[in-house]
A protein has these predicted regions:
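Acidic donor-binding loop of glycosyltransferase active sites
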Residues: 102-104, 269, 273-290, 299-300
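C-terminal alpha-helical cap of glycosyltransferases
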Residues: 365-380
Length: 380
């Protein structure tokens, strides 16, 4: 296939789970042809307005916001303004399209994706949706009938989209996430100061940390780390929670000096690939990117889906693996009692771990960005 220079608009963002796939797709398009021009469209005030320029791409913001779930005066005022912001955003999106003259429009989810794709499809611009999750959101479901191609990462998405438009590509992830080797494991154990003679659990509640994960860890630690013989734990607690965890750990270590040999914690883990490699069992939320990374790394994982997401999509993501015996799941409501005991019990079952690793690897979809880029070229 010839990879001629293109003019491409990529819209969406709001969370890293939308932004990273978008940047990955852009990077692959530029790799195939450095002359390709790419313009991002995001939502004013959202993280894409910082993250995308940091990745080297131009971005334009729309005045779009979403409906707020909590009932406060500020949120009520925001919600009343949403229809006007949508109209204004669609109008601005039309102007952006007229000026940039894209050959293809791509939506990756998030507030800005909807008005941009609405405008693009009405203006006859070939369009593509990249749906990261196993349960499609309302906006993408509505847009699915208007775009030409829908790239997905899970089976069964014909529940939400026209079957003839669906292409199974997987979610773009960083190239460092590969099947973990013994050499990588040894490097990860050394990187994070773990005991090579022990088994290892990695607890990660997302880049910002998880209050529920942290509460569950504090409960387990305050009870004396039951079941931790021959085990150490690497725990990403999140920057927001770090000060409180520092104080808690100082108090607990004073009572139990051996704690410092059982639990290592940090506000942020920079080398996730090495942390995954070091771990015999991972405890994780089940956002789309995390699921794809863990499959690529062939890891045994206990998923605890976040309840604070639209359409409960993290549960759908996790269950896609659980049904294939490629992961385990604990409900968020049960995490305080079951998070650590479930992981520790799994750690004592090497045959189960091996089975989970093998089946997770079977669900990996490598080179997703290239597959999506190929679909983009088919539209022009």
């Amino acid at each position: 296939m010839e990879h001629k220079a293109l003019r491409v608009i990529i819209s969406g963002g709001g969370t890293g789970g939308h932004i990273f796939p978008a940047v990955s797709i852009a990077g692959k398009l530029k790799e195939l042809n450095p002359e390709t021009e790419i313009l991002f469209v995001g939502a004013n005030g959202k993280m894409e307005m910082e993250k995308v320029p940091a990745a080297g791409y131009k971005i334009v913001g729309l005045p779009i916001t979403g409906l707020q779930r909590q009932l406060t005066l500020k949120n009520i005022i925001n919600d009343l303004s949403v229809p006007f912001r949508v109209v204004s955003s669609i109008s601005k999106a039309r102007r952006i399209i007229k000026e940039f003259k894209p050959q293809v429009a791509i939506g990756v989810g998030g507030y800005a994706s909807a008005p941009l794709l609405m405008a693009a499809t009405k203006m006859g611009i070939p369009s593509l949706i990249q749906e990261q999750n196993g349960f499609a959101g309302l906006t993408n479901k509505k847009l699915g009938g208007k775009v030409q191609c829908i790239c997905v990462a899970y089976e069964g998405m014909e529940r939400f989209f026209p079957a003839d438009k669906i292409v199974m590509t997987g979610n773009p992830i960083r190239s460092v996430f590969v099947p973990c080797t013994q050499e990588m494991k040894e490097e990860g154990v050394k990187e994070y100061g773990l005991d090579p003679a022990k088994k290892h659990i990695f607890v990660v509640g997302g880049s910002l940390g998880s209050s529920k994960f942290n509460q569950s860890m504090r409960k387990w630690i305050s009870e004396g780390c039951p079941g931790s013989e021959g085990v150490d734990v690497l725990w990403q607690c999140g920057k927001y929670y770090k000060a409180g965890i520092d104080q808690f750990m100082a108090e607990e270590t004073a009572k139990n000096p051996a704690l410092k040999d059982t639990v290592r914690y940090s506000d942020f883990i920079g080398r996730m690939d090495l942390a995954y490699a070091a771990a015999d069992v991972v405890i994780s939320r089940s956002g789309a990117s995390s699921v794809s990374e863990l499959c690529a790394a062939h890891k045994a994982v206990v998923f605890i889906p976040s309840p604070n997401v639209a359409e409960d999509h993290q549960t759908h993501n996790a269950m896609a693996l659980v049904r294939k015996d490629a992961a385990m799941i604990v409900k968020d409501a049960d995490a305080m009692e079951k998070m650590m005991p479930t992981a520790l019990e799994l750690l004592r079952k090497p045959e189960k771990i091996a089975s989970l690793e093998e089946n997770a690897g079977k669900m990996a979809l490598p080179d997703a960005a290239r597959k999506i880029a190929d679909e983009i070229y088919k539209l022009v």
